[in-house]
């Protein structure tokens, strides 16, 4: 019984340390993110309804002020182009995004990228600093780069979440 309690305690400590050790990238070269990205999969909180990660990214652009502009393609009856402004923050890999339909602000953090193949990002509620959704994007469809890194990030989510794999036939093509 003592061994079981010790094992559970040590496992909990390791899990807490793993959660605290995954942060956004220390440095980010925004210019290398420019271009299209295809969503591969997403993990999001059960109650999280914002569709930002449900879309392919047609274009990432840098504004003269150093912010990012995302042009995404949303699948409705047809493909609709939408633009989002991501305002830079003090941290190079974190951007603030306001979503008018939700009347809420979120922090979009670039967790990991190799710039050429994949990018992993997470949305956090600005008020609660809790990850609400994380997504895995690739430059080319079906490359499967960054899968292990994405799984590590998903394991740090502290809330119940749903995994959603992209159905490329149902998504707008970039």
Swiss-Prot record:
Protein location: Secreted
Gene name of the record: LGB
Annotated source species: Trichosurus vulpecula
Disulfide bond as UniProt keyword: yes
Intrachain disulfide bonds: 79-172, 122-134
Protein name: Beta-lactoglobulin
Keywords: Disulfide bond, Milk protein, Retinol-binding, Secreted, Signal, Transport
Role, per record: Lactoglobulin is the primary component of whey, it binds retinol and is probably involved in the transport of that molecule.
Gene3D superfamilies according to UniProt: 2.40.128.20
SUPFAM superfamilies in UniProt: Lipocalins
GO molecular function, one term: retinol binding
GO cellular component terms given for this protein: extracellular region
Quaternary structure (record): Monomer.
One Pfam family recorded for the sequence: Lipocalin
Principal location listed in the UniProt entry: secreted
Protein family per UniProt: Belongs to the calycin superfamily. Lipocalin family.
First and last residue of the signal peptide: 1-18
Keyword NADP among UniProt keywords: no
